[in-house]
Amino acid sequence: MKKILVIGSLNMDQVTKVHHTPKVGETVVGNGLELIAGGKGANQAVAMGKLGADVTMIGMVGTDDFASQLLDNLKQMGVTDKVMKTDKAPTGTALIMVNESADNSIVVIAGANGLLKPDMIKPSWFDDIDIVVLQLEIPLDTVAEIIKQAKARNIYTVLNPSPATHLDEDLLK
């Protein structure tokens, strides 16, 4: 079985249902609030874990209750956790409004995800790894360093270019 390494975001999604998405300056009433383990990186790892893949997740969370819940979720879904904790920022969150047509509007607050810096990437993370999976909810310079290190080892790399942003062409080669 191939070994997969996901390096990316872990967020606590705070989801509410609304009749319609508010316009500028408008306040709308939400229907309930649901806390759901999320983050593009964690979602990728969990999906592969549910399928029985040998997957490891690396990212950063705070030292708060959301961090504990997110790490418990990874474990329950069969994902090996090598997530780092920091007291310098809270765990990342996403504020999500879902309207009656099931269209959503999302605001992501990076929190600890934004503290995963290029100089923190360890060559040992890539030992015995067959596939690296990334997305863009961690700093772009960190993504570039991860791609560089994976490429140097000829590791197949998957980049989910979301949230959308301009990417240097060299990053995609």
Label for each model-derived stretch:
Residues 65-77, 96-98, 102, 122:
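Active-site-proximal loop->helix
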